[in-house]
């Protein structure tokens, strides 16, 4: 039994300290103040004095409460009463002294303290279901308290839990407070009607003292005992409820964990971040980072993801997804209703393609000179990129693109700008690699081909060879039963040019090309450039509708109002119909070749849509770059410094040329050397380009442009060299050479001589000396050697000595005898071969 102070005992029994000190003194226990402690022996003496002073009868009752199939609680209840006088109802009793209630409450409190002091009490896990069952059972047991008309029951039952049995050491939570109060009153009423002998009371006292030592409380739950004591103390000496003292409430967990995972529908937009995706799925960002890591992608919670990656994550985590329609504004603005308009026939749009030096440019020049009015022949703007040719049977629109690279980018953007491809093949050269590539591009775009066999005026021309080579590549001429027209032409003499144009018009009739001539205009950007005094200039091919001066247009991420329009002859015009190439001024910037051009009635919406497109491009670019960097992080780990980088600053005259060169240079990158275009633009090379080149150690390349005076002065000071080109193929070749110079040289072994061992001499001073005959090349003293036996290498090392007769020799040539001493090797035998080699550096090539 734990020690307790007089003040604590007075507080537990609700008595004044002075009154308690007097009562202790009457029992022979001398205490002077409330801070004095009561030993277990004194407490035992106090209990015996109180019990011996009572003229009472006792009764003990043991009940068992089952919670479920495995658990139960045994409760032992001892009740005491004293009959003051007889009444009509035998159940009614009165207390002998009010102090009995205090004594009983004191005993219960002491017993609770005993339980709390046990070191081996095991903490029992609370079981919510067991608590519910216990509450239901106690509610069934509890009945209304007996009331009589004449007297009140003033005696309080003294309750002691003798033993709590909990199988598997699983504890049970404390029962509800109200149910325990009712149960206590019910037990008391049962004790009133019980007649117990004095002898049995004495036996119960002994059992009580024995179990108070701690044996009966090994598996008791202190929380339950303290709550029972608190419930008893909440009644006063007359059985009424006290208002101030309240038993502590048992905290219950109100959240119920869902049995099944909630499936959510996640709306995914382009460039969604990891944190946004986690918030929409109601998970932590670290879980999504973990899923990405398992997919081989390293990411942070603030990183943007592309839609495909976000879809994989949502599906991996068991949710559904919907794609956000970010093109709602674009569809509402750009889609034009043309149901009330009629279609008319339009001129075909033709692109001339072919291998370099096959006469493509010469053929274009001849068509320009012969099919344009003589007075206007020299007035054609060379950079317009598109022009119209009028014939007796109709008009033809030619596209003068920078090459097949730009044509490929147009097809990739989905701009249906070309109707027919004229494939130029030199009769004296035949099919070349770029010819094959042009065929593949045309077939991929499903565009019909008209073959122009050029240079037939040369003596070595062989048109039949060209037909045979193209037939092997599935380009079958009509004369062989195919559907491809072949026309023999000469760009120098003009032979066959009229037949070529007639074949193009015939092919266009078969295609039945039509377009809308009314309504808002639609088209495609052929070329764009920046001109001094005019600003951004774009060459646009109108495909549908009627483009007028003053219209609000949107070209990719650029917008503006058409301030002026010029046709292919450089004349100002007010309107342009389908299949008409025009130059327009007034855009906010330079659009990319292949961007769609649309007319929008509301300038505010055009500006808003341009900003939206620009933002989407930036987000997509950032997401793609981060995906590429992070996906290659593990592969590049530990390989830093192995891959060389050639940094280039590219400036060109027109947007199409810059894009074509950029794509061609990026394709040159290999595992050892990478081409990195850190900046590109249109216009002259400026001082800012030179400053950037110095800071990043980059090469400055100009295509059909030159550096201004300020840039030249700065370049001389900083030692920056400019490289100017006007032919794309020369530029690519020089870049290849520069990349080859960055490659690490390759080490190769070259055998320079072989000596055959004819005889072996043993020397105590020099070891084994091989007498050899040089049968091939030359044997040098300083070069490494290999010893071969039966053409198998058995040793590799260096020469220790090389002698000719008795003199040292630096080298011995073929057909001469010599003595060779191999360093650190004495097992040279007759018939072996000594192979002499040298290691040389060989420059790598791409």
Curated annotation (Swiss-Prot):
<dbReference type="InterPro" id="IPR005225">
    <property type="entry name" value="Small_GTP-bd"/>
</dbReference>
<dbReference type="Pfam" id="PF04760">
    <property type="entry name" value="IF2_N"/>
</dbReference>
<dbReference type="InterPro" id="IPR009061">
    <property type="entry name" value="DNA-bd_dom_put_sf"/>
</dbReference>
<feature type="region of interest" description="G5">
    <location>
        <begin position="490"/>
        <end position="492"/>
    </location>
</feature>
<keyword id="KW-0648">Protein biosynthesis</keyword>
<feature type="region of interest" description="Disordered">
    <location>
        <begin position="198"/>
        <end position="219"/>
    </location>
</feature>
<dbReference type="GO" id="GO:0005829">
    <property type="term" value="C:cytosol"/>
</dbReference>
<keyword id="KW-0547">Nucleotide-binding</keyword>
<keyword id="KW-0396">Initiation factor</keyword>
<feature type="compositionally biased region" description="Basic residues">
    <location>
        <begin position="207"/>
        <end position="219"/>
    </location>
</feature>
<comment type="similarity">
    <text>Belongs to the TRAFAC class translation factor GTPase superfamily. Classic translation factor GTPase family. IF-2 subfamily.</text>
</comment>
<keyword id="KW-0342">GTP-binding</keyword>
<protein>
    <recommendedName>
        <fullName>Translation initiation factor IF-2</fullName>
    </recommendedName>
</protein>
<dbReference type="InterPro" id="IPR006847">
    <property type="entry name" value="IF2_N"/>
</dbReference>
<dbReference type="GO" id="GO:0005525">
    <property type="term" value="F:GTP binding"/>
</dbReference>
<dbReference type="GO" id="GO:0003924">
    <property type="term" value="F:GTPase activity"/>
</dbReference>
<dbReference type="InterPro" id="IPR000795">
    <property type="entry name" value="T_Tr_GTP-bd_dom"/>
</dbReference>
<dbReference type="InterPro" id="IPR027417">
    <property type="entry name" value="P-loop_NTPase"/>
</dbReference>
<feature type="region of interest" description="G2">
    <location>
        <begin position="379"/>
        <end position="383"/>
    </location>
</feature>
<dbReference type="InterPro" id="IPR015760">
    <property type="entry name" value="TIF_IF2"/>
</dbReference>
<dbReference type="InterPro" id="IPR009000">
    <property type="entry name" value="Transl_B-barrel_sf"/>
</dbReference>
<dbReference type="InterPro" id="IPR053905">
    <property type="entry name" value="EF-G-like_DII"/>
</dbReference>
<dbReference type="InterPro" id="IPR023115">
    <property type="entry name" value="TIF_IF2_dom3"/>
</dbReference>
<feature type="region of interest" description="G4">
    <location>
        <begin position="454"/>
        <end position="457"/>
    </location>
</feature>
<dbReference type="Pfam" id="PF00009">
    <property type="entry name" value="GTP_EFTU"/>
</dbReference>
<feature type="region of interest" description="G1">
    <location>
        <begin position="354"/>
        <end position="361"/>
    </location>
</feature>
<feature type="binding site">
    <location>
        <begin position="454"/>
        <end position="457"/>
    </location>
    <ligand>
        <name>GTP</name>
    </ligand>
</feature>
<dbReference type="InterPro" id="IPR000178">
    <property type="entry name" value="TF_IF2_bacterial-like"/>
</dbReference>
<dbReference type="GO" id="GO:0003743">
    <property type="term" value="F:translation initiation factor activity"/>
</dbReference>
<dbReference type="InterPro" id="IPR044145">
    <property type="entry name" value="IF2_II"/>
</dbReference>
<feature type="binding site">
    <location>
        <begin position="354"/>
        <end position="361"/>
    </location>
    <ligand>
        <name>GTP</name>
    </ligand>
</feature>
<feature type="region of interest" description="G3">
    <location>
        <begin position="400"/>
        <end position="403"/>
    </location>
</feature>
<feature type="binding site">
    <location>
        <begin position="400"/>
        <end position="404"/>
    </location>
    <ligand>
        <name>GTP</name>
    </ligand>
</feature>
<feature type="domain" description="tr-type G">
    <location>
        <begin position="345"/>
        <end position="512"/>
    </location>
</feature>
<dbReference type="Pfam" id="PF11987">
    <property type="entry name" value="IF-2"/>
</dbReference>
<comment type="function">
    <text>One of the essential components for the initiation of protein synthesis. Protects formylmethionyl-tRNA from spontaneous hydrolysis and promotes its binding to the 30S ribosomal subunits. Also involved in the hydrolysis of GTP during the formation of the 70S ribosomal complex.</text>
</comment>
<dbReference type="Pfam" id="PF22042">
    <property type="entry name" value="EF-G_D2"/>
</dbReference>
<keyword id="KW-0963">Cytoplasm</keyword>
<dbReference type="InterPro" id="IPR036925">
    <property type="entry name" value="TIF_IF2_dom3_sf"/>
</dbReference>
């Amino acid at each position: 039994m734990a020690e307790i102070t007089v003040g604590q005992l007075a507080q537990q029994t609700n008595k004044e300290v002075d009154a308690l000190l007097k009562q202790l003194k009457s029992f022979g226990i001398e205490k002077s103040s409330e801070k004095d402690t009561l030993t277990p022996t004194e407490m035992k003496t106090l209990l015996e004095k109180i019990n011996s002073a009572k003229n009472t009868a006792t009764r003990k009752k043991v009940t068992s409460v089952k919670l479920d199939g495995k658990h139960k609680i045994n409760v032992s209840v001892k009740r005491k009463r004293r009959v003051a006088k007889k009444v009509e109802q035998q159940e009614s009793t009165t207390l002998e002294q009010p102090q009995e209630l205090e004594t009983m409450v004191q005993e219960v409190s002491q017993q609770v303290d005993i339980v709390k002091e046990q070191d081996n009490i095991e903490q029992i896990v609370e079981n919510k279901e067991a608590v519910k069952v216990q509450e239901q059972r106690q509610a069934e047991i509890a009945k209304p308290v007996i009331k009589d008309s004449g007297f009140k029951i003033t005696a309080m039952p003294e309750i002691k839990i003798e033993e709590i049995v909990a199988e598997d050491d699983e504890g049970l939570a404390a029962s509800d407070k109200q149910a325990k109060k009712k149960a206590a009153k019910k037990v008391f009423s049962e004790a009133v009607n019980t007649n117990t002998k004095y002898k049995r009371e004495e036996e119960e006292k002994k059992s009580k003292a024995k179990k108070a030592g701690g044996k009966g409380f090994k598996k008791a739950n202190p929380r339950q005992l303290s709550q029972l004591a608190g419930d008893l103390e909440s009644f006063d000496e007359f059985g009424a409820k006290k208002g101030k003292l309240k038993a502590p409430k048992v905290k219950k967990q109100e959240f119920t964990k869902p049995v099944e995972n909630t499936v959510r529908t996640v709306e995914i937009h382009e460039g969604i971040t990891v944190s946004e995706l986690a918030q929409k799925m109601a998970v932590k960002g670290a879980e999504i980072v973990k899923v990405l890591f398992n997919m081989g992608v390293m990411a942070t919670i603030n990183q943007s993801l592309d839609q495909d990656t976000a879809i994989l994550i949502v599906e991996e985590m068991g949710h559904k997804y919907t794609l956000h329609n970010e093109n709602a504004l674009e569809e509402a603005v750009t889609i034009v209703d043309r149901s009330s308009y009629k279609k008319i026939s339009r001129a075909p749009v033709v692109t001339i393609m072919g291998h370099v030096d096959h006469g493509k440019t010469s053929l274009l020049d001849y068509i320009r000179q012969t099919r344009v009015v003589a007075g206007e022949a020299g007035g054609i703007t060379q950079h317009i990129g598109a022009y119209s040719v009028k014939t007796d049977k109709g008009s033809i629109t030619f596209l003068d693109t920078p090459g097949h690279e730009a044509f490929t980018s147009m097809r990739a953007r989905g701009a249906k700008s070309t109707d027919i491809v004229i494939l130029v093949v030199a009769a004296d050269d035949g099919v070349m690699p770029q010819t094959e590539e042009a065929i593949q591009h045309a077939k991929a775009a499903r565009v019909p081909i008209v073959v122009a066999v050029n240079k037939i005026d040369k003596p070595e021309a062989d048109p039949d060879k060209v037909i045979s080579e193209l037939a092997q590549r599935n380009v079958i001429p009509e004369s062989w039963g195919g559907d491809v027209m072949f026309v023999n032409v000469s760009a120098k003499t003009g032979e066959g040019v009229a037949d070529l144009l007639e074949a193009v018009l015939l092919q266009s009739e078969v295609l039945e090309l039509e377009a809308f001539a009314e309504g808002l205009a639609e088209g495609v950007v052929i070329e764009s450039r920046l001109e001094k005094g005019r600003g951004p200039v774009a060459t646009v091919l109108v495909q549908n509708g009627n483009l007028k001066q003053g219209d609000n247009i949107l070209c990719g991420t650029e917008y503006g109002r058409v301030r002026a329009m010029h046709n292919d002859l450089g004349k100002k015009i007010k309107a342009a119909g389908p299949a008409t190439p025009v130059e327009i001024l007034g855009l906010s910037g330079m659009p990319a070749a292949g961007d769609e051009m649309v007319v929008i009635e509301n300038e505010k919406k055009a500006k808003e849509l341009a900003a939206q497109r620009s933002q989407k491009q930036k987000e997509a670019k950032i997401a793609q770059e981060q995906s590429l960097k992070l996906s290659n992080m593990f592969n590049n780990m530990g390989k830093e410094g192995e891959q060389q980088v050639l940094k280039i600053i590219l400036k060109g005259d027109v947007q199409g040329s810059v894009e074509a060169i950029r794509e061609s240079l990026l394709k040159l990158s290999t595992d050892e050397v990478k081409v990195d275009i850190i900046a590109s633009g249109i216009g002259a090379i400026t001082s800012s380009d030179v400053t950037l080149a110095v800071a990043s150690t980059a090469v400055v390349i100009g295509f059909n442009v030159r550096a201004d005076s300020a840039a030249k002065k700065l370049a001389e000071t900083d030692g920056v060299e400019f490289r100017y080109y006007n032919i794309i193929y020369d530029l690519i070749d020089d870049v290849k050479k520069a990349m080859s110079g960055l490659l690490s040289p390759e080490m190769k072994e070259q055998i320079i001589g072989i000596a055959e061992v004819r005889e072996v001499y043993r020397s105590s001073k020099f070891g084994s000396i091989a007498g050899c005959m040089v049968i091939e090349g030359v044997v040098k003293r300083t070069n490494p050697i290999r010893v071969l036996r039966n053409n198998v290498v058995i040793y590799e090392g260096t020469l220790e000595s090389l002698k000719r007769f008795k003199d040292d020799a630096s080298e011995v040539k073929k057909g001469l005898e010599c003595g060779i001493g191999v360093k650190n090797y004495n097992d040279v035998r007759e018939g072996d071969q000594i192979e002499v080699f040298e290691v040389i550096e060989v420059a790598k090539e791409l």
